[in-house]
């Protein structure tokens, strides 16, 4: 991306709608409630022939530094300072307010490039607000409708004029963009038999979502990883509303980490905005590969904690538990032993899941947590040679034969791995519909133990093998 643009303005002027328009996706939550956006949300924008990095920000308000609104304002001001250009959005339909004028004065004092955007200019009665925008002293306002996509060519021209043609259209390095080696494993050749077990790619970027109940310490943990106050934190529950992604590097490996809104029990989620936030969290889980579920070590294993883990496993993601606020625990050795016993007992569907005690406030245990994420990702990507699987299947049947149905024993004939991420296997057998669930669990637990696959979802699909003599009998 050649340059960075920050979208700023007071609450509810249409900043997130414009952000979604420019990135071409509904990444930012949009609602009539003021103050929906709280953290900085980055994205890759496309506007006609322009390509640039865009940052959505919280609505700017006059507030004390100690308040939530004051902390949101500090994040927005940081986005302005880091950007090459600011899109200052005002509501042409409603007209200017005292806050608009205060923000315009702040932007003028900074002396950075600014494009004044008069949004909602398609609305009846917007002319007065549009002409009032000239009084802000930030040049000609650019009339647009972010919701309907009107005025985008004018906005493109205003950006090029403000940023300069050379920065807007830097020379392209075609070789850097096209000469990319894509490993075969990235293409996805699921369903093929595996003769050799491919090595784990230590350089592949990791996608990690951080989830949990409200106020479990998710944003604090990510800030500690980054070494900066990138995300809003505080004692107020439910600060995070959007799923925000941040990029950083751990031991030379790129990590894209998603902060998410706290997930409460479904019965308690009644407001439309909170429902949108939870839906956004679910999208983050599905986009991620490894999901870290934050438990509050002082009150662990709430019903909602267990339901979140179950959701992650059902979605097929690799899961890791982080027992946060470990610095508040006194008899740590005894408590850790108790927590691990309860983890295995209460989460049989994720037997062996890695659980790491951490302290997000102090940073204790973060290296151990990252190592657990990498180790779990290795298992989630694991592929096992077909020959090994069939030898294993034969041994399992000797040790514990499948049950008999109507006096005839079910035979498991052949096994192969059909995909990874998560590991999934196909077994060809007789009477697959009669195989009891208890025997399926026996096979899954055996795979976990014998092939070192703790804590990740394992899928087994059964296919009834055809009897070649069946058609002859019917003739």
Curated annotation (Swiss-Prot):
The entry's keywords: GTP-binding, Nucleotide-binding, Repeat, Ribosome biogenesis
Annotated Pfam families: KH_dom-like, MMR_HSR1
Name the UniProt record assigns to this protein: GTPase Der
Role noted for this protein: GTPase that plays an essential role in the late steps of ribosome biogenesis.
Sequence ranges assigned to domain EngA-type G in this UniProt record: 3-167, 206-381
A Gene Ontology biological process term: ribosome biogenesis
Superkingdom per UniProt: Bacteria
Key word Metal-binding present: no
Entry's family note: Belongs to the TRAFAC class TrmE-Era-EngA-EngB-Septin-like GTPase superfamily. EngA (Der) GTPase family.
Sequence segments annotated as region (Disordered): 168-199
Gene3D superfamilies: 3.30.300.20, P-loop containing nucleotide triphosphate hydrolases
Oligomer and partners: Associates with the 50S ribosomal subunit.
Sites where the protein binds GTP 1: 9-16, 56-60, 119-122
Domain KH-like: 382-466
Binding site for GTP 2: 212-219, 259-263, 324-327
GO MF annotation list: GTP binding
Comp. bias intervals (Acidic residues): 189-199
Originating species: Rhizobium rhizogenes (strain K84 / ATCC BAA-868)
């Amino acid at each position: 991306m050649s340059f960075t643009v920050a979208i700023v303005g007071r609450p509810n002027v249409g900043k997130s709608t414009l952000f979604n328009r420019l990135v071409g996706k509904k990444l930012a939550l949009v609602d009539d409630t003021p103050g929906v956006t709280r953290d900085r949300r980055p994205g890759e924008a496309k506007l006609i022939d322009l390509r640039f990095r865009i940052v959505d920000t919280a609505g700017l308000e006059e507030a004390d530094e100690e308040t939530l609104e004051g902390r949101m304002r500090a994040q927005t001001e940081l986005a302005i300072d880091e950007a090459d250009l600011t899109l200052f959005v005002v509501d042409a339909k409603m007209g200017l307010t005292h806050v608009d004028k205060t923000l315009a004065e702040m932007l003028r004092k900074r002396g950075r490039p600014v494009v004044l955007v008069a949004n909602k200019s398609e609305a009846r009665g917007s002319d007065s607000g549009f002409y009032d925008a000239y009084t802000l002293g930030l040049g000609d306002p650019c009339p647009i409708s972010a919701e309907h996509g009107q005025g985008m060519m004018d906005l493109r021209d205003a950006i090029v004029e403000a940023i300069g043609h050379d920065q807007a259209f830097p020379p392209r390095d075609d070789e850097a963009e096209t000469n990319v080696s894509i490993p075969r494993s990235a293409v996805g050749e699921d369903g093929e038999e595996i003769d050799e077990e491919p090595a784990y790619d230590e350089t592949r970027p990791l996608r990690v979502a951080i989830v949990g109940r409200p106020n479990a310490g998710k944003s604090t943990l990510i800030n500690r990883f980054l070494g900066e106050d990138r995300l809003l934190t505080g004692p107020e529950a439910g600060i995070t509303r959007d799923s925000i992604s941040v990029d950083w590097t751990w031991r030379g490996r790129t990590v894209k980490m998603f902060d998410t809104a706290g997930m409460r029990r479904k019965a308690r989620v009644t407001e439309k905005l909170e429902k949108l936030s939870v839906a956004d969290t679910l999208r983050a889980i599905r986009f991620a590969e490894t999901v870290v579920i934050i438990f509050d070590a002082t009150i662990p294993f709430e019903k909602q904690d267990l339901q979140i883990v179950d959701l992650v496993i059902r979605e097929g993601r690799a899961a890791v538990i982080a027992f946060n606020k470990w610095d508040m625990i006194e008899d740590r050795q005894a408590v850790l032993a108790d927590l691990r016993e309860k983890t295995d007992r209460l989460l049989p569907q994720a037997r062996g899941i890695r659980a790491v005690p951490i302290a997000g406030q102090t940073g204790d245990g973060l290296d151990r947590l990252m190592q657990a994420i990498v180790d779990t990702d290795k298992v989630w990507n694991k592929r096992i040679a077909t020959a090994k699987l069939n030898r294993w299947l034969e041994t399992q049947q000797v040790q514990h034969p499948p049950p008999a149905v109507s006096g005839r024993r079910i035979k498991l004939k052949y096994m192969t791995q059909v995909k990874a991420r998560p590991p999934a296997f196909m077994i060809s057998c007789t009477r697959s519909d009669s195989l009891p669930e208890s025997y399926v669990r026996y096979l899954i637990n055996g795979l976990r133990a014998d092939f070192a696959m703790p804590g990740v979802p394992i899928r087994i699909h059964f296919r009834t093998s055809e009897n070649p003599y069946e058609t002859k009998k019917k003739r």
